[in-house]
């Protein structure tokens, strides 16, 4: 199993591809749908689904363009089911003259659980705090977790947007992400990948925090 990061859109949010043979899952198609679709075509991949870590505009900007091209379902946490169609909730309403909206998700995630999509087995980890419906996707077979804007290399997600809460975010990180095996790669919503051990030891936002 392989993965590929593709920074897209004006804020360079990371879209991800999880690839097994000629099939793939797409995570957070935040912009530049033509670029995402072209990569899929060039690699001869068959996408099976789109999984959203959360519904902020920079992670959903190309959602409809990609889903309609490949006719695939979209997964999102139920707490943000109304955000795709509401620019004031997904944050694009703050931008001048740009409102990002998308059609409703096909499948709503309720909390921690498991997803089996084709050859892919994922654990859904409910990790609110950056947003009320943030989900991290743990792929044990690939030793990685796609964390969205919850945890970054040397940083954590912002909590000053709608539904954000710093205490909730820190609890999510410590209870759901830092309890994963230390070698687990953390694929973040912006910037480079990191790993659980590095963030346990070096992340200044997590030092001194205790439950």
Curated annotation (Swiss-Prot):
Membership in a protein family: Belongs to the metallo-beta-lactamase superfamily. Glyoxalase II family.
Cited Gene3D superfamilies: Ribonuclease Z/Hydroxyacylglutathione hydrolase-like
Entry protein name: Probable metallo-hydrolase YqgX
CDD domains: metallo-hydrolase-like_MBL-fold
InterPro entries: MBL_Glyoxalase_II, Metallo-B-lactamas, RibonucZ/Hydroxyglut_hydro
Residues annotated for Zn(2+) 1 binding in this entry: 54, 56, 130, 149
Keyword vocabulary terms for this entry: Hydrolase, Metal-binding, Zinc
Cofactor dependence: Zn(2+)
Cofactor: binding comment: Binds 2 Zn(2+) ions per subunit.
Zinc keyword on record: yes
EC number from the UniProt entry: 3.-.-.-
Record organism: Bacillus subtilis (strain 168)
Enzyme class, UniProt record, top EC level: hydrolase
PANTHER family the record matches: HYDROXYACYLGLUTATHIONE HYDROLASE GLOC
Residues binding Zn(2+) 2, per UniProt: 58-59, 149, 190
Pfam families reported for this sequence: Lactamase_B (PF00753)
Entry keyword annotation includes Hydrolase: yes
GO molecular function: hydrolase activity; metal ion binding
Lineage: Bacteria, Bacillati, Bacillota, Bacilli, Bacillales
């Amino acid at each position: 199993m392989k993965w590929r990061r593709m920074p897209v859109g004006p804020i360079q949010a990371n879209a991800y591809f999880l690839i097994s043979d000629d099939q793939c899952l797409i995570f957070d198609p935040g912009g530049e749908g033509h670029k995402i679709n072209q990569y899929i075509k060039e690699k001869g991949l068959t996408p099976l689904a789109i999984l959203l870590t959360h519904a902020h505009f920079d992670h959903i900007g190309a959602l409809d363009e990609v889903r309609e091209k490949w006719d695939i379902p979209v997964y999102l946490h139920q707490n943000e089911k109304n955000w795709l169609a509401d620019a004031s909730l997904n944050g694009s309403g703050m931008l001048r003259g740009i409102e990002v909206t998308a059609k409703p998700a096909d499948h709503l995630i309720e909390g921690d659980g498991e997803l089996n999509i084709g050859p892919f087995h994922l654990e859904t980890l409910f990790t609110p705090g950056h947003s009320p419906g943030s989900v991290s996707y743990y792929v044990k077979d690939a030793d990685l977790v796609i964390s969205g804007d919850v945890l970054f290399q040397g940083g954590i997600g912002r909590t000053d947007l709608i539904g954000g809460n710093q205490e909730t975010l820190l609890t999510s990180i410590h209870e759901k992400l830092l309890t994963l095996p230390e070698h687990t790669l953390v694929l973040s919503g912006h910037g480079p990948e990191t790993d659980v051990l590095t963030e346990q030891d070096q992340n200044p936002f997590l030092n001194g925090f205790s439950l």
